Amino acid sequence: MQDIISLYRNYPKYNHLKDSDIKHYIRPSILLNQYKKHYNNNKLVGFTNWAYLSDKAQDILQNEGVISYQDWNSGNNFWHIETICISNLKDIMSWSKNNLTKTFGIGKIIKWLRTDNETIYRHSQITTKGNWLWVQ
């Protein structure tokens, strides 16, 4: 988990946090295998995590911007929690779209929050699309 914490250290918004705070923040997604580490030439360049929220947990996230430990895998509402990266954003987002569509199917709603300095400024959602799937 230290490699992910080191990745977070590239962003000023996390520099006021102790390593233990970041660990606490990402631990639920790690324990539930609701994350992906992204590599380029064997170097960690990105991290993505997500949650499956109940209606109640979704309401709390939308209003307060927090997810309780027990809520990370509590329902059928899919939330893209975060993607951080130091490079390869286009490839990481392509992987994310493909993975979401393979996992949930076409026409499913994916939600996320936009924040700035711990303040929620936009709720967003998108519907998965067939053209997000890679030919394999």
PLM features per residue range, with description:
Residues 1-23:
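Short amphipathic alpha-helix that is part of the acyltransferase structural core
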Residues 24-40, 52-56:
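A short helix-loop-beta-strand connector motif used in the catalytic cores of GNAT acetyltransferases and
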